[in-house]
Amino acid sequence: MKEQTTMPNKLPKLEGCSYTDNLSTVKRQISSAASAARRSPAEISLVAVSKTFQADRIKPILASGHLFFGENRVQEAVEKWNPLKLLFPDVRLHLIGSLQSNKVSEAMALFDVIETLDRPKLAQAIARERDRTKQCPNLLIQVNTGEEPQKGGVLPDRIDDFIERCQTEFDLTVRGLMCIPPLGEEPSLHFGLLREVGRRHDVERLVVTSGVSSVRSFNS
């Protein structure tokens, strides 16, 4: 199972700095953290969370060469990114918000990665759309490692069965696992749980996140 870290950030504008300046600052921080961890910065990708940002505020970041972006809502993303992708066809979009079954067709046409697969009904809808279009984005299963009722994701005691159903009943390739550890708890415990699950099911990528201002892992 491979791990590659990315650090999503909503790129709040720092005092006296542009968004591109802020992006450069975050990338320098990532490079320093990678060196401290004896990892190559090339293994790390930054997913800029662009939800609620208008296209004119995203274009300078795209023009700077950044290609990885995360969105929460399908309809907002479709309206924003369909025109932008004509100008920047190499951009890679991650759906990081909950996906409703009736939005699957639009989501699969737009996103390169869906990070929030978490229930059989959604898996079935994705499989049907995959069969119809013969295409499928990378799929990540969200695991609710903290068993928090306000968060989406599969509970730990159900994750093995859900992965098996995705792989056998729906013939879906699970590319990774994602979790959002509870605030105030040691994240490594939750990341360790994902690693164990991933090894049991030969999932090749591990995705871990502490939200838009902290750490996310993804191997794109």
What are these regions (language model features)?
Residues N219-S220:
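C-terminal accessory segment of soluble enzyme catalytic cores
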Residues K2-R216:
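Conserved alpha/beta-domain cores
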